[in-house]
From Swiss-Prot:
It comes from Shigella flexneri. Pathway: Amino-acid biosynthesis; L-arginine biosynthesis; N(2)-acetyl-L-ornithine from L-glutamate: step 1/4. One of its GO terms (molecular function) is L-glutamate N-acetyltransferase activity. It is an enzyme of class 2 (transferase). The gene is argA. Homohexamer. It holds the Pfam family AA_kinase. InterPro entries: AceGlu_kinase-like_sf, Acyl_CoA_acyltransferase, Asp/Glu/Uridylate_kinase, GNAT_dom, NAGS_kin, NH2A_AcTrfase. The lineage of its organism: Bacteria, Pseudomonadati, Pseudomonadota, Gammaproteobacteria, Enterobacterales. Feedback inhibition by L-arginine. This is Amino-acid acetyltransferase. Its EC number is 2.3.1.1. GO terms for cellular component: cytoplasm.
Amino acid sequence: MVKERKTELVEGFRHSVPYINTHRGKTFVIMLGGEAIEHENFSSIVNDIGLLHSLGIRLVVVYGARPQIDANLAAHHHEPLYHKNIRVTDAKTLELVKQAAGTLQLDITARLSMSLNNTPLQGAHINVVSGNFIIAQPLGVDDGVDYCHSGRIRRIDEDALHRQLESGAIVLMGPVAVSVTGESFNLTSEEIATQLAIKLKAEKMIGFCSSQGVTNDDGDIVSELFPNEAQARVEAQEEKGDYNSGTVRFLRGAVKACRSGVRRCHLISYQEDGALLQELFSRDGIGTQIVMESAEQIRRATINDIGGILELIRPLEQQGILVRRSREQLEMEIDKFTIIQRDNTTIACAALYPFPEEKIGEMACVAVHPDYRSSSRGEVLLERIAAQAKQSGLSKLFVLTTRSIHWFQERGFTPVDIDLLPESKKQLYNYQRKSKVLMADLG
């Protein structure tokens, strides 16, 4: 029998290996809202969390219980009370909160403990621990309204948490915490997840929502937001009366976490199977990241970037789209190159060759990774090269191309005669390639 060759699996694994190495030993805080726990895909999410643990990632899982608490209140005909969009937890509500949280604690612990069953890692033991790692205090009275047993974090026992994580345990935290006087308080899962991520200096905080992430006006996923942009989204939703959706609650915490040193916060769908793995082990992810600095950067190339540039341009050279460059030539001309990198992978490049006497420059070796050719990376490179040319005192920019004539024309370049090229460039013109010459004024 001939076995089926699964090339997609091979390619996917090759691309995921750098992320496996990067994530190993790092601390991730995962925030699971009650809505995610109720969804039919929750078992798959738990299995993926178990897989992350098996890869050496230190995990803190924080679960919420909002819909479960509301269901308990409804079943006992107890009206939920809110003040300024915060739940007022009276004595009766607290008992129902503890009931919901306790049930979820046992259920999630059991699921995590068996998450590696029916896998090659079956038999590997996952130790799940919970405890009084958080000390709570009451919210108190606001505008004459007593929040009763609704609370906030007073302090976190970071040392105890680190000891558990270093021992290889998954830490599971729920919405109920005790005070120094032994009273129980109801806390929000987003506050717990956010403060744990900050105090533990977590690499990532990950949250789940019903959609694939934050969307723009066209309904497309926004792959990256800075904290000020995320804050604006929160305020816009609050103006519409949305204070407690999973997306808003997570973004609120993500803004605070990023500004306090957590490098990346990820918002993904709890409805999509494998979303957690796709987000963490692929270059572009599948949801929305909130970051202090972009995962993507544009900069001048250095000698260390030669390997990445060669890997990017070789296929285009083999197709005859680009003129072939040897490694030695690239080493000598590396200072002329600008690259776009994403997660340390070169995804686009271009070079500027100035001709100072004629006050003209050539934009050459323009290449964009196939995965990003429908994006704006080409325009970004063109803008950067044009800016460099103007800073160098050049007044015109030209390109030689056999395939991208219309692309450059759409961006202000016009076809010109070969005679308008700088004299030294004209002498090197390859009449066999018959490249078109296009030129633009830099203004």
